């Protein structure tokens, strides 16, 4: 299988705080599969580290109040260039790019709501199966 994954889950230090979300469980699952790693946020030109961002209505805003929607959309569009032939995507939980079925509520309080990140919305529109890492 050809599987697209959030780069942070593979140990790439592209998370907003400069770290990663390496998953040994994912690493084991991916053995024998073709893997494509993406970080839509970095692909959209956002630095690492960066202020955390959350979806607020139809915009993405960082904790400093700056609208970063354009960067998130640009990065998601660039990441979409890598989907040809993929069988599924396994992505980071609650991310404003990669969150699947659950994201933070936009108040930077840690509260979660039902919803998808920007990149996940695009993947689902193309009929691609998206799995949250916590559901693997």
Describe each region flagged by the PLM.
Residues 37-40, 89, 131-133:
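General beta-strand structural signal in soluble alpha/beta enzymes
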Residues 21-62:
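Short, surface-exposed acidic-centric catalytic microdomains
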Residues 11-18:
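Short N-terminal binding/cap micro-motifs at the start of the first secondary-structure element
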Residues 1-4:
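Extreme N-terminal starter segment of soluble prokaryotic enzymes
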Residues 78-107:
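N-terminal glycine-rich phosphate/adenylate-binding segment common to multiple enzyme folds
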Residues 8, 92-95, 135:
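Short, well-ordered beta-to-alpha junction loops that form the rim of enzyme active sites
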Residues 43, 52-55, 59-81, 111-136:
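Divalent-metal-activated hydrolytic enzyme cores
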Residues 22-36, 74-89:
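Short amphipathic alpha-helices and their capping/turn segments at secondary-structure boundaries
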């Amino acid at each position: 299988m050809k599987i697209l994954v959030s780069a942070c889950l593979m140990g790439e230090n592209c998370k907003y705080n400069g770290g990663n979300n390496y998953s040994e469980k994912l690493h084991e699952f991916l053995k024998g599969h073709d893997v494509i790693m993406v970080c839509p946020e970095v692909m959209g030109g956002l630095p690492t580290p960066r202020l955390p961002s959350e979806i607020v209505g139809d915009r993405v805003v960082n904790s400093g109040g700056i609208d970063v929607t354009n960067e998130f959309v640009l990065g998601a569009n660039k990441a979409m260039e890598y989907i040809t032939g993929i069988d599924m995507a396994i992505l980071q939980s609650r991310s404003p790019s990669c969150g699947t079925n659950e994201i933070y509520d936009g108040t930077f309080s840690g509260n979660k709501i039902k919803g998808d990140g920007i990149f996940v919305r695009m993947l689902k529109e193309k009929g691609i199966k998206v799995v949250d890492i916590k559901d693997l």
